[in-house]
Amino acid sequence: MIRFTLALAVIGVTFAASTPQIETNPNLEIIGGHDANIIDYPWQISFQHRLHHFCGGFLISDTWVVTAAHCIYEGYSDTENLNIRVGSSEWSAKGKLHDVKRYITHPQYNITTMDNDIALLELALPVDLNQSVRPAKLPVAGQEIPDNAQLTITGWGATYVGGYNEYTLQVVTIPTVNINVCQSAITNDTITNNMFCAGLIGVGGKDSCSGDSGGPAVIDGQVVGIVSWGYSCADPKYPGIYTKVSAFRDWINEETEI
């Protein structure tokens, strides 16, 4: 069963799609990380519905944000109740809130296979750029993800099983996993060319999950991935799956001219 998480501050929502079932779950979290300072990750944003954090994302300009397509679904797609917080290590305070003007989900996003799990948010007003608010550096189109590279993930997911979102930004670093090794672990679903994997296979204990969906995954200062889906969190048997940003570089440019 595929599991991904849209973590709300105080509630969880479950819905089913066709096989495999896709389930939100408030008990999955970033594990094995530590507190982070937004100055070190100034592209990170908190994607919020009615002022409650439920997904991550990252700035690519002063008016555009990238997140996961699965973060935008029925019940959480009403733009009048969507906003982002920038420039703060805390999702609930400081920095500045910005309204979402519109969103664009990838036209080929598949909720069953989780392929093309990417979306864009256009902000109503531009953010003020400073040391805590800065667009991410993106890879070039077609850039591949090396095996065993150190992937850094940030987000506000809970820090223990069954917990709520963490109020302070968390960071964790895990290695990328060879695509064939990953596919041998993820036996019931396909790892497409638009995805890559990361995790401590055989060890576990560190991972991204709830509240981190849509957030940035960074290698050498570039945001190369988007937190997308997985069978579990921090499980030594299963790596996490990330949307490969370089596979969508042309689409991002077509929609945003960035």
UniProtKB/Swiss-Prot annotation:
- Supply the enzyme class, top level: hydrolase
Tissues and organs where the protein is expressed, per its UniProt entry: Expressed in larval carcasses and gut, and adult gut.
Q: Which reaction does it catalyse?
A: Preferential cleavage: Arg-|-Xaa, Lys-|-Xaa
* One Pfam family hit: Trypsin
UniProtKB keywords: Digestion, Disulfide bond, Glycoprotein, Hydrolase, Protease, Secreted, Serine protease, Signal, Zymogen
What cystine pairs are annotated? Answer: 55-71, 182-197, 209-233
Any one annotated GO CC term:
extracellular region
InterPro entries in alphabetical order: Peptidase_S1, Peptidase_S1_PA, Peptidase_S1_PA_chymotrypsin, Peptidase_S1A, Trypsin_dom, TRYPSIN_HIS
Cited PROSITE patterns: TRYPSIN_DOM, TRYPSIN_HIS
One of its GO biological process terms is: digestion
Q: Which residues form the propeptide?
A: 17-29
Q: Where is this site: Required for specificity?
A: 207
> Which Gene3D superfamilies does its entry note?
Trypsin-like serine proteases
Q: Where is the Peptidase S1 domain?
A: 30-257
Known glycosylation sites: 110, 130, 188
What range does the record give for the signal peptide? Answer: 1-16
Q: Where in the cell is it found?
A: Secreted
Listed SMART domains: Tryp_SPc (SM00020)
Q: Which residues form the active site?
A: 70 (charge relay system), 117 (charge relay system), 213 (charge relay system)
Keyword tRNA-binding listed = no
**From the UniProt record, which GO molecular function terms apply?**
serine-type endopeptidase activity
Instruction: Write down the EC number.
Output: 3.4.21.4
**PANTHER family xref list:** AT26814P-RELATED, POLYSERASE-RELATED
Which family would the database say this protein is a member of?
Belongs to the peptidase S1 family.
Q: What protein name does the entry list?
A: Trypsin
User: Which species?
Assistant: Phaedon cochleariae (Mustard beetle)
